[in-house]
Regions:
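Signature of multi-pass transmembrane helix bundles
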Residues: 1-50, 107-115, 120-251, 255, ...
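Alpha-helical multipass membrane-protein architecture
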Residues: 30-33, 38, 42, 61-62, ...
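Transmembrane alpha-helix/helix-exit interface in multi-pass inner-membrane proteins
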Residues: 52, 56, 249, 253-266
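Transmembrane alpha-helix boundary signature
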Residues: 53-61, 94-101, 158-161, 219-224
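Alpha-helical membrane segments and immediately flanking helix-loop junctions
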Residues: 73-151, 273-328
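Interfacial helix-start motif at the membrane-water boundary
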Residues: 46-53, 81-83
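Interfacial/capping segments of alpha-helical transmembrane domains
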Residues: 58-76
Length: 335
């Protein structure tokens, strides 16, 4: 049995455990996580379905511009999609733009989970939740975290068994963008922060337009935006993810509890207080609580946690569930 299939079996066992705990009154808190996993389909659908339906249109419109630019350095146009999170349109857009399937998987599942998630989720959401006086620590942590993205992309690609030359060439645009973002955070931090917030709002507008147009077309048969994929294509993906998350959240709760002591010990050795050490563990499931905890962390903990969330956000949570739903064979490289 491959590791990917092993993970799916673990998630399946999580479904049974969570379901039983829900039946018997949520005695261990796993029944609640069972519900939480299934209920996450709503937010996921809001963030994903619109861009899934628009992906063919975006690829058709931007393709003539993007393809020649990326071909100049020998990179696959799919790498353009890494500016979006994997579960917020990065994956479907990458696969639409991809000239090589492996490059599409590298971009849409591995790199987008780090770079795209940072651009469209971690920065705008984090800035909205952390205290204003913590922004310098947040920026410093992002600066450190961004440097890990090319390394993570290369390692993930090699674990997936992709051709090393293909991986390295396609990392060139990622390295360039990571360096530009890092330089921006050093020299023009306010402009970078404002730009990230504006970009995040723009993505929400695009996603909403796609969702509304696709829903209208489904209900009436009237096409507003020609070339869109049917809304059901996106909803099928969401359903697949929801089934996996039924088991992911209960299992994740058990994993986080098991890892809590060793990771807390590591955190304390790195010089963080208890809150900072706890943030390292929680990020693996969901980074949103960590932003709210930052006000109680010491300065070192704030920087380390922000750097950690760039490659690690939801690695054992939504990103694991999403990958298992769309490409189970890519679970190991993504994680």
């Amino acid at each position: 049995m491959s590791f990917d299939k092993f993970i799916i079996w673990i998630m399946a066992i999580g479904v049974i455990i969570g379901g039983l705990d829900r039946i018997f009154g949520n005695r261990f808190g796993l029944g609640e996580k069972f519900e939480e996993g299934f209920n996450s389909m709503g937010p996921l659908a809001l963030g994903m379905v619109g861009i899934v339906t628009l992906a063919p249109v975006i690829a058709k419109v931007l393709g003539p511009v993007i393809i020649p630019i990326f071909n100049l350095v020998g990179a696959d146009p799919a790498m353009f999609a890494t500016i979006l999170a994997n579960d917020m349109g990065g994956y479907p857009l990458a696969m639409e733009l991809a000239q090589n399937e492996e490059a599409g998987l590298l971009a849409g599942l591995i790199v987008a989970a780090m770079l795209g998630c940072t651009i469209v989720f971690s920065i705008p959401v984090g800035l909205g939740l952390i205290e204003y006086e913590d922004r310098p620590f947040f920026a410093k942590g992002l600066l450190a975290g961004l440097t890990t993205i090319p390394v993570g992309g290369i390692i993930g690609g090699l674990i997936a068994g992709f051709d090393i030359k293909m991986v390295l060439i396609n990392m060139i645009p990622v390295i360039v963008l990571s360096v530009l973002l890092a330089l921006g955070l050093v020299y023009i931090p306010k402009m970078m922060i404002n730009g990230a917030l504006i970009f995040g709002k723009f993505i929400v507008v695009v996603i909403t337009v796609g969702l509304a147009a696709a829903a209208f077309e489904e209900l009436t048969g009237v096409v507003i935006i020609p070339g869109m994929a049917p809304i059901m294509d996106g909803l099928v993906i969401i359903g697949q993810i929801g089934v996996v998350l039924l088991g992911t959240f209960p299992i994740l709760t058990l994993i986080v509890k098991a890892l809590e002591k060793p990771l807390n010990a590591v955190g304390q050795k790195l010089g963080m207080n208890a809150t900072g050490a706890a943030g390292i563990v929680i990020t693996l499931a969901n980074s949103i609580p960590v932003y709210k905890m930052m006000k109680d962390m010491d300065p070192k903990g704030k920087v380390i946690n922000t750097a950690w969330l760039v490659p690690a956000t939801a690695a054992l949570g939504d990103h694991l569930g999403f990958t298992a739903g769309v490409r189970p064979d890519m679970i190991t490289p993504v994680v």
